[in-house]
Amino acid sequence: MSGTGSFSGTHGAAPDTRLRAKSLLIAGGGTGGHVFPAVAVAREWLARGGEGEREVVIVGTERGLEFKLVPQAGLPLELIRVAGLKGIGGVKFFRNAALLPAGLWDSAEIIRRHRFDVAFGVGGYASGPMMLLATLNSIPTVIFEPNVEPGFTNRVLANMASRVAVAHRETGVRLGRKSVVTGCPVRREFFSVPPKEHSLPFRILITGGSRGAAPINRAVVASLDLLAPRKNQLFVVHQTGERDYNDVRVAYAQREFHAEVVPFIENMAERFAQADLIVCRSGAITVAEVSAAGRAAIFIPFAAATDAHQMRNAQAMRAAGAARLIPQDELGPGRLTNEIFSLLDQPRRIAEMEQRARALARPRAVEDIVDLLDGLARPAGGKGVGRQ
């Protein structure tokens, strides 16, 4: 099988004296919270070597966002057959469980074809079998946990990993002595968001993620009549997702709000820079972006998030004085309106939340993770001996 640092030949052939590329396996995916850190780490890994000196392979599934986002980033993607088991039952559980042997086979084949020096697991379905096979093949492993509450896969993998990179100190306490606090990798443009001078109109960015969040969309629409008496003090940018776009757009227009309603936002960092307040979910990446940009936020955690990790993320930010929190089951028009007006009337409180949010950011998260991987990686400078 051909590949970097490999050779084929017959008895008596001269040995291959080329130096083998230092190779990183990144496993996992599913949501943006898995894929964006994977891409950021892959790019930093490659940037530390000259042409041909380093390589990376990202492994995921065809169901996750990685299937689209990794190739768009110009990075190699390999797929395994695996699906989730936690929180499901009935026929779907047995159907997904039946994929486990295939997923382990696919993982073993990928390990066989490549000569990885270190492996990085970002969580998600593909992370489990790939990191297990990496461990069984004596490849040093690092798993990454971006949430305050560790996910199921990472709780299992932490016992066998060489190191655990965590975004929060309290997570490190839970996962033990192998933990290293690195922070959460965030795109550079969020750290470039400057402090905002606050003036009217008060600019609110509302987003439930790239696909939108129906509960947030419904709550905002239900709040518009209560917000209307002060609508001339407000400018709203609302990312709805495709499904609710038209209904939400019409609701703002009927009440003559100053608003920009869009199904999707391409340059989110630019929108963060314009915002005085962000109303959003509290996934790990979103929370890290809010911190990096130094913005005040009202977090509305996704109620069905696995292990309630979004609630724990939001609670940590609230405890630090960096955000407000509205549980989804309390998300009525009165509560949302009161929170918005409270912050509109307290610019000093907004400024304090911004300072505290920015203080939680870790600008070197990507570099620190790659430092950790470099320190654990098996020496890659030896002669290529082929991939067996």
In which residue ranges do the predicted regions lie?
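Nucleotide-sugar donor-binding and catalytic loop/hinge architecture
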Residues: 5-22, 70, 189-206, 213
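Donor-nucleotide binding loops and adjacent catalytic segments primarily
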Residues: 64, 69-73, 195-278, 311-315, ...
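Glycosyltransferases and closely related glycan-assembly transferases
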Residues: 106-120, 126-142, 155-159
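Acidic donor-binding loop of glycosyltransferase active sites
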Residues: 116-118, 273-288, 295-296
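A short, well-ordered alpha-helix in the C-terminal region of glycosyltransferases
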Residues: 349-363
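C-terminal alpha-helical cap of glycosyltransferases
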Residues: 362-388
